Amino acid sequence: MDPALLDDVIRRLLEVKNLKPGKNAQLSESEIKQLCAAAKEIFLQQPNLLELEAPIKICGDVHGQYSDLLRLFDYGGYPPQANYLFLGDYVDRGKQSLETICLLLAYKVKYPENFFLLRGNHECASVNRIYGFYDECKRRFSVKLWKTFTDCFNCLPVSALIDEKILCMHGGLSPELNKLEQILNLNRPTDVPDTGLLCDLLWSDPSNEATGWAINDRGVSFTFGPDKVSEFLEKHDLDLICRAHQVVEDGYEFFASRQLVTIFSAPNYCGEFDNAGAMMSVDDTLMCSFQILKPARKMMGGSTNNKSGFKSFRGW
């Protein structure tokens, strides 16, 4: 993709900050297709299990909440001021999935060694056909553009290992995951199957309800108990599993005696939850701290207070 065009696309996407909330960026279908093609090429050049180094900032689900994505960058620094890893679920539910995914892909293309995107369960045609992204593509551009995104999403990597100690994915562990090399060997491009390792990495959830593996209420994949987390970390000499996939009230939530953390980065998710969003910063000693994007509070008369900045403190 022409570097001058890429810079101009990023400029137009960031200009939205100065417009009325919810205003769309002015991009053409041709420009978005070029972005998808360039990003797809980079995804396939890089491994399915990314090997990354701290310092890095990690974000969970964003779900088309574009103004909140911009708030995350306002706080953490716009690329390349900081390195980023996003854990998937960029589209669906929120009103501006197109702006959200386009900015993330543009940063991936511009800073391929500093900016990383993993696949979430919503980066899959059978899911985002239903939960909003297909309709947004069709309404604003075309079904053909949605298919272009599907081809791009089918190439996304699914896991990242930070300094050989923090394993990241969208969903969670899998009963089929015995060696990390298995992730490297997953074929791409691929759709997300209904069962198996790739499905579990994108869909599974931790659960305090039971030990071991159990049926997941989502109707897909499994849940895993604290025992499975401890067992996995010990076997692979890891310190922490970092995942997203579930709304958590404070934007982050520990599990299994701080051996696993869930990060969710869409505050006031869908306008229905009063949850905070969070971003986890990992410094070069692997100390983790959390920046909290507080939910907007309803004010008297039904207006909203959006002056909900961040707070930061040490964790884990």
From Swiss-Prot:
InterPro entries for the chain: Calcineurin-like_PHP_ApaH, Metallo-depent_PP-like, PP1_catalytic_subunit, Ser/Thr-sp_prot-phosphatase, STPPase_N
Cofactor binding: number and manner: Binds 2 manganese ions per subunit.
Catalytic activity: O-phospho-L-seryl-[protein] + H2O = L-seryl-[protein] + phosphate; O-phospho-L-threonyl-[protein] + H2O = L-threonyl-[protein] + phosphate
Keyword Protein biosynthesis: no
GO CC annotation: cytoplasm; nucleus
Keywords, sorted A to Z: Hydrolase, Manganese, Metal-binding, Protein phosphatase
GO molecular function, one term: protein serine/threonine phosphatase activity
Protein name: Serine/threonine-protein phosphatase PP1
